[in-house]
Structures are given as C-alpha cells and as structure tokens.
Amino acid sequence: KGEFMSLTFSVKNKKKLLGGYAKALSEREISALVEGLFFFNSEQEEPSANELGADVMIAGVWKKSVRGFELNYEDGEYIVRVYTPSGVGDWQIALELLSKLSAQTGSKIECDNEKIYDSEQILKFDYEADIMWGLEALKDIKEKNQTLYISGVERDVAFDAVMVDEIFASASPAAKFDEMMRQVQYLDAYSAREHLYQDKDGNEIFGAYTLSENLPTILPYAPSPSWQAQEALGDRKVSRWVLTLVVGVDDSDAQVLDECEYGAFMANLPKEKYHFIDAANVLVEPLSEDEMKEILQKAKA
C-alpha cells in the first residue's frame, strides 16, 4: 500500500461572539483562496456550495498536483494532511491554502510536529526536508528489491530500485520524484480497471482487464491483485488473468472480440505498441481490430 506517513496541519475557525464557531467555508469559498484549487474526489465538476465537513476531500490544482492533499473540517478546525513524500506542487498549494486560512481566521497553524506557524511563517516551511525524509523510506524497497505503489491524484505509480536510483542520482531528488509522479498522472489514456471473478464452483478466482480498440490504455504488464483486492481475497490466490478485447466501441456497437491469456497477449504485443510508464504499468497505443486479431492469432498459437 502506497502510504508512508504524513504531516497534519490544523487551523481553528473564527469563534462567534456568543460562543461556538463561525460557519465553515464552502468548497467554493475554499477553492477561491488558491488559484485553480479543486477537489479530485468530488462528484461535481465545479466546487459546490456545500460547507466543508468531516468528509475528506483530496484538494489540488490540475497539472500542478501529483498526490493532492487531504482537507476536511472537524470540531471547529480546518485540517490539512500532506502525504510523505509529496510532490513539490502538492506542498506549495497546501502551504498557500494554510496561509490563506490562517489569515482569514486570524488563527495560528498548528502542525503535528508540535510547531506553530503564522500565515507568513508557513510559507517558509521546509517541505523539501519532508519530501527527502519520505524518499529515504523508498531506499528500503531498493534493498528488498520490491515494487512500491504511491498513490496519485489520477493513478498510482509503481516505483522499483531502478527508479529509486534515478531519483537519488538527480541534482534535486524532490523535483525528480515530482516529475516522475506527474508524468503518469496526466497521461491522456484510459486506466483499465481490474475485475476479479470466481468460477461457478467458487474454487478458482480469475482476474480480467479489458482493452478496447483504438483506445490508448494503461495496463499492468504482469498483473497481480491490487492491495484492495488482496485484502478481500485473504489467502486465496488469483489462478489466471485474462484480457478481454472489445471492438466496435466507436460506433456504439461494442462487442467482445475475444479473450486471451493475459501474459500471452503481452508477450505478442509488438514492442512499438507499448511503453512502460513506471515499474509495473505500460501504456498500450491504440490498436485496430485487425491488429488485435493478428496479436490474438500469435498469442493463441
């Protein structure tokens, strides 16, 4: 699971003269404090008039955020939680928002590192040190030769030893990490979702992904259950993975062309038709129905 740690900041709301707190700002009012701020996990296109509440919103700015940060309002306090390690952009946006909230409420900003900041001091917060601290934890995966998934605003990113080396070989590891995360977040491609099924006797579990014709798609190169799926599976294993190929999507006459053993399809996918975007996932270029049939023929031979 791609969470290490985080830092949490809180800003007390204004008190009312007769006791209690002023009304919490609405999503719309919050988003007006920082240019371009919106909520990645909101159902609405635009920030709504709903007051901020206990529900955690993932806040950020399109193309500037890589992981976003958590924002909610509880017990008269605005709470901002920034993941470790976050991107440079995530930190800049979070600190700007905290500064604005502090200025507006007249309250200091309290951090769970036991320090207190005013609206000016917070802008000088040494976030690079926090990113570096988080990146140090990445070195563990290098020693254990593992792949670690770090959550992003649009999709998770898989890091392995090679990528960790690249981060630390860079003049600014924090900026390099930010760049690696960002490249994957804003790719113009569909992220395929995993589906798990059991056979009718309930003995075997198999996993499936779908690839549609003419659609650039991000797929795992060698699938394994996501941590969410693994939690649901417990000790049970996925016995096989298949790729379902769908055609006729463009003329709303979508139908399954065929399904194929996942590994066999990937092994026969021409090299110029995909590239790795991180340690585990590939971007598959748009394939026509004919190209799909050709790959299927080889994969099933």
Where are these regions (language model features)?
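Extended, charged low-complexity segments
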Residues: L233-A301
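Short, extreme N-terminal segment that most often corresponds to the first beta-strand
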Residues: G2-G53, K142-A169, E294-A301
